[in-house]
Structure formats: C-alpha cells, structure tokens
Amino acid sequence: MFAFGFAPILRCTNFVSMSRSKKAHSAPLPSASSRFMQRPLDEKTATEMALAHHLTFAACQGWAGTTRLVSELVRMVYLTFYVQCEGYGDTDIARFADAETALENCILRAGDDEVCRISPGERALVEPILRQADTQLFLAPRLALIEAYKRLDRFLRNSNESPLPQTAI
C-alpha cells in the first residue's frame, strides 16, 4: 500500500485457457492497427519527446525558465500520472503531488518578467516524475499514451483543479 492509502492502478492481463472448441475461434484476430497501437513509440519519437521534457526542465533550472515552460512541466506531471493510471508506472502517488506543488510554488515566485527558476529542492521533487515519464515514453504502448493525452486534454478544457487524487495532496 502506498502513502495515503492509494495504490496505482496496475493492469494485469488474465489469460484464460480455452479449449479447441468453436468458442476459441469466435473472437476476431486483432487487426494490424490494433497491434500497432499496442506497441511502444518508435525510439526516435520517444527520444524527441523525452528530450523536450529534459530541455524544458534544464531551462527552468537556470534563468531561462518562464511560467510557460514550468506550466509545460506541470502538464508532463499530469500526463505521467495519467499514463500510470493506464497501468504503466509505479511512482508513489504522493510524489506526483510533491512535484505539482513544487512547480506551482515556482510559478508563484515569478515576478512581472515571468522568469521562473526551479530551486534545487524543487528539482529533487520533479526528477522522479521526469524519470518515470522517460520510462513510459519508451515502454508504454501508444494506446496508453493516447488515452493519457485525451484525459489531459479533457482536464485542461474542463477543470482548474488538480487531477491528482485528493488523498495524495
């Protein structure tokens, strides 16, 4: 059990043995497109997406960070959480809330010039989520990533509150 009594949702595939009856052959075979969606991103795409996260994070550790860039990191935290909800990740839910709070504090400190700088303490809270995001980009199937992006899009259009479970905050 994780902190605050909330464990990440893990998907397990249950294999049921079927006899060689008519039932075993009644299910259609997966199409090529569904097999494609069950595979991870190609290495080039995953690398480009991970690099974008890391460059944004690096910029925000120096004086090149802006509220817009930190907001992109908040989106990365939420997206990583949603991919974990699809069954691909094992980060303690409280770590997501810690990273979210650290990034929000960074935005609140921004002055009129909107320059944001992530402190070393905040960096330590965001790094585990960044590592989890990297792992997900290289290992999670496309379908899980697409579903997570859809959830993120719905959240961004309909809510101003955190998508993280209240018990984690």
Where do the language-model regions lie?
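A ubiquitous short alpha-helical element
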Residues: 38-41, 88-92, 111-116
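Short Lys/Arg-rich cationic patches that frequently serve as NLS/NoLS or arginine-rich RNA/DNA-binding motifs
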Residues: 2-38
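Short, low-complexity cationic-aromatic patches
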Residues: 57-72, 111-127
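Amphipathic alpha-helical binding modules
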Residues: 116-169
